C-alpha cells in the first residue's frame, strides 16, 4: 500500500520509473512508443507549472468551453433525504459538447500543438471522448483519429456520422 505524503501533489509522488508503489503502476509500453511518450512526459512536466500555458488553458476553459465556470445546482431532494448535508452538482452538460471530457480534450490539443503534431489521437467507448477530441481538434486545426473497440462499433455506429460531421 502506498503512503501519501502530506503537502505534496499525488502526481509528484512516484519514483523515476513512474511507479506509485504497490504491485501496480508505472508504464509498460511497446519500444516504438517509448520516445514519443518520453517527449510528451518532458513537455507535460514543463508546461504543468508554466504560468502562460496554464493561463491559456484557463482561458479556453472559461471562455471557449463555457462562458465563465459551469454552474452548480443544489440537489434539494437528495439534501433532504440525507438529512441536511448540502449536496450540489456541477452542470457540465452546459459546456461545449455537453460533457466534462472537453476539458481533457482541450488540454491534449494544446499539448499536441505545442509539440508540432498534426494529429490528435484518442480512444472512445460510448463516443463522448471521441466527440470531445473531434471538437477540440477542429478548433486547433488538428486532424483527429478516434479508435473504438471492435465490440462497441455495431452498437454505436451512429457516432461515426457525428465524428465526420464535426
Q: What label would you give each PLM region?
A:
Residues 1-166:
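PLP-dependent amino-acid enzyme catalytic core
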